[in-house]
């Protein structure tokens, strides 16, 4: 994915792109991290030539750095479910012919034996970025839109998970279509708590936000109390979720007082856009 594909990811853009915990990242900061990570992946090579690079990282600034860094270096990004069992990971890594795995901290520790057995290089985000020192900075390749960009694995409800491949052109078409349909602008602010190994979280929320210059607040899970506080404070003007999330939110209402429930409902009412997607919304819930 070329830099032009995400027009707000520029070195001179000081607007906030990501909020990850207590840290805000500007588009310029994110762009710099992506470039350094991409250069570190290349290690002096001109192009990754669709090398399959998996990552085991929850929604975070590191996740964005890895996804876009792999794209800019010419690889195929393979985000994995951080809740997957070893057997499922083994299947995904083997069937995708993964050569490198990116993971941090405890996630990295849990993958050491598996990656060693499969002869997959296991490195952290920081390791890759540090490898892009001033003496080893690689110019980034020009990526044709028809090249493969991402492989997502299905949920495996009928059989083992299957890898579904998207090209850079496909991703651009999906993102720009959704931006137009939902009238995304750089003034939008949205929370991301959906899984980032599925298309809803990756494309509908994260990619649309970054492409349009909006701000996304990153959560590794649906933290109802914390997100509810932000809804009351009018932090978000866009909210996208699956029906299960709305069910959990309604169940949460039973544990708090009615005044607080009303404040949360009023916060939703003030948003410009609420979406329930990826599955049918039950009539009773609607």
Model-assigned labels for residue ranges:
Residues 4-26, 44:
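AMP-dependent adenylate-forming
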Residues 23, 38-87:
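Conserved AMP-binding/adenylate-forming
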Residues 26-28, 149-176:
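Conserved AMP-binding A3 loop
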Residues 82-114, 131-132, 174-191, 223-237:
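Conserved ATP-dependent adenylate/AMP-binding module captured primarily in the ANL superfamily
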Residues 86, 117, 121-123, 220-286:
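Conserved adenylate-forming
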Residues 106-146, 253-256:
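ANL superfamily adenylate-forming
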Residues 135-153, 159-160, 183-189:
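Conserved pre-ATP/AMP-binding loop-to-beta segment of ANL
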Residues 172-189, 199-240, 248-256:
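Conserved AMP-binding/adenylation subdomain of ANL enzymes
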